[in-house]
């Protein structure tokens, strides 16, 4: 693999400087480009669907800060709302009307949610949701799925996806065995394994937590009946069903994957889009569960910056802008995502490059496969069948052509309302050129 080092010379210098003062030179592991080789690209600005690196190179962006930027970079309405609020105050550590306004809007969009608590990250959301599930049931065991990533809380760093998958780690040192022992992992899409587990230990299980689309081990769709089957198992055994929609929330549909696939979870975890590009998370769900959260109930959770007005106004403006006028802007982004995914499939067939392409709403994923007859429906298959070396060559071929994709095959891609047909045309032209040289 040849990387045009002169094109990224300032990024390389920045990375060398960062490594002296930041562990690994980055503040989140996947950003280190271990999944594609070379040095990470350093960016300095973004506008709409485009970003510019420190060397002055312009890219069409399909990472979008790992999903939050549904409207694209620096959307005028969001920027103006943040600027106006910043002049009024950035944080009060006290209630504001913005929290209630955003809460009401989320409840309007997601039918299963009756109450919501805002936090500062997706990790806080999942960690708090699991604590709430244990408080509600009096049980300790958590069930998660291999390759699904729910943040970096100790109990969830067991066979996780995202950066953990990119680095090839089974789990993380520093997680006590006693904590890991309370987390049981099974393969994604294996409803029989879940049923067997509940048959043996159902009375001990506090919660099942699952990504509706396993987008932290690439892009794995649920098999028909998998998610609804999990819901039935939790209901039968008195466990809490937690749908982690930190990534899929407001991305695959206005009401998330649960609205798209008619699911009714007990608790939902949200993040990314509801902060409009600022740090945010939320856990939400049925009133009888949320009423256990302090100060209404005994389950303690708190945060200095939780519900801060900058994140609230950014999220509120993003959702109001995306889901107005019969969701026209959002649906147009869905159409562009479908066109991009179909183009990838067609070009893969034309150049005889084995691919597994998936897309739902404004999310997509593209696996390069080791064999034409390979498939990926879970983490075992992702590790065995994904051709990461070929993806790395593809990543840099696309970057050299001004297209920025996730620097890991085990991450999803995103389209924004700022993307255009011309962006898709340029992207598919670059894909064809890249495929021709792979």
Curated annotation (Swiss-Prot):
The protein's enzyme class: isomerase
Keyword check for NADP: no
EC id: 5.4.3.8
Keywords from the UniProt entry: Chlorophyll biosynthesis, Cytoplasm, Isomerase, Porphyrin biosynthesis, Pyridoxal phosphate
Pathway note: Porphyrin-containing compound metabolism; protoporphyrin-IX biosynthesis; 5-aminolevulinate from L-glutamyl-tRNA(Glu): step 2/2; Porphyrin-containing compound metabolism; chlorophyll biosynthesis
One MF annotation (Gene Ontology) recorded for this entry: pyridoxal phosphate binding
Pfam families to which the protein is assigned, alphabetical: Aminotran_3
A biological process term (GO) from this entry: protoporphyrinogen IX biosynthetic process
Cofactor needs: pyridoxal 5'-phosphate
Signal peptide range: none
Annotated GO CC locations: cytoplasm
UniProt catalytic activity: (S)-4-amino-5-oxopentanoate = 5-aminolevulinate
SUPFAM superfamilies in UniProt: PLP-dependent transferases (SSF53383)
Record's subcellular location: Cytoplasm
PTM-bearing positions, type N6-(pyridoxal phosphate)lysine: 272
Alphabetized HAMAP family for the sequence: HemL_aminotrans_3
Subunit structure: Homodimer.
Family the UniProt entry places it in: Belongs to the class-III pyridoxal-phosphate-dependent aminotransferase family. HemL subfamily.
Name of the molecule in the record: Glutamate-1-semialdehyde 2,1-aminomutase
Source species: Chloroflexus aggregans (strain MD-66 / DSM 9485)
Lineage of origin: Bacteria, Bacillati, Chloroflexota, Chloroflexia, Chloroflexales
Annotated gene: hemL
